[in-house]
Amino acid sequence: MDARILQDNDDTSLPVNQASVTRIHKKPGKAEAEAAVRTLLLWAGEDPDREGLLETPKRVAKAYQELFGGYSESPEEVLGTTFEEVAGYDDMVLVKDISFFSHCEHHMVPIIGKAHVAYLPEGRVVGLSKIARVVDIFARRLQTQESITAQIADSMQRILKPRGVAVMIEAEHMCMAMRSIRKQGSSTITTTFTGDFKEKADQQVRFMTLIRT
């Protein structure tokens, strides 16, 4: 299949675990996606023509379109509208317990967790729902937890230009719970700090204290 090369060192809307040179192939059509699901059913030992599976290829293709909808969205669009009339407020803005789901890029099984996101505004703020939307944009892609954490922080720092951003993610990985070592209930915690959150220990302490209260 022919491929074209796209180079963009500043595009954090792309997963950060991709190289700055990203190979983009022609996107398959709906029929090709459904055929791929049918092939997987056959490979698993199933009969895709039995009654219960007749519509499965269509359903899976439709579900994947929603589950991986983050590829068609960008944080620039979501964070582009800000408000400057904040009566001089310049302290921490924290949105915690943002539930999300993603999919492991290694096994394509779910990652389920919650994100805590804070920033220190520099003269302007963004709608609170926009922060949750940014989490979803990056979560609805094939990911690693480390990448999601960094992408949220990097995009907010780059677009909003605040004095700092703090992100913590707590999640359970079904690739650990459902396969291999099969350890249900274990969680992974990742953090990323920029600006004042990275340079000032007291700001990190405030962030960590607030998300635990």
Curated annotation (Swiss-Prot):
**Do the record's keywords include Lipid biosynthesis?**
no
GO CC term, one of those recorded: cytoplasm
- Single GO BP term: one-carbon metabolic process
GO molecular function terms here?
A: GTP binding; GTP cyclohydrolase I activity; zinc ion binding
Q: EC?
A: 3.5.4.16
List UniProt keywords, sorted A-Z. GTP-binding, Hydrolase, Metal-binding, Nucleotide-binding, One-carbon metabolism, Zinc
State which pathway it belongs to: Cofactor biosynthesis; 7,8-dihydroneopterin triphosphate biosynthesis; 7,8-dihydroneopterin triphosphate from GTP: step 1/1
In this chain, Zn(2+) is annotated as bound at 104, 107, 175
Q: Does the keyword Ribosomal protein apply?
A: no
Catalysed transformations (reactions): GTP + H2O = 7,8-dihydroneopterin 3'-triphosphate + formate + H(+)
Q: Where is the signal peptide?
A: none
Q: Family assignment?
A: Belongs to the GTP cyclohydrolase I family.
Oligomeric state and interaction partners are given as: Homomer.
What HAMAP family does UniProt report for this protein, alphabetically?
FolE
Instruction: Return the protein name.
Output: GTP cyclohydrolase 1
Species: Brucella canis (strain ATCC 23365 / NCTC 10854 / RM-666)
Gene name for this UniProt entry: folE
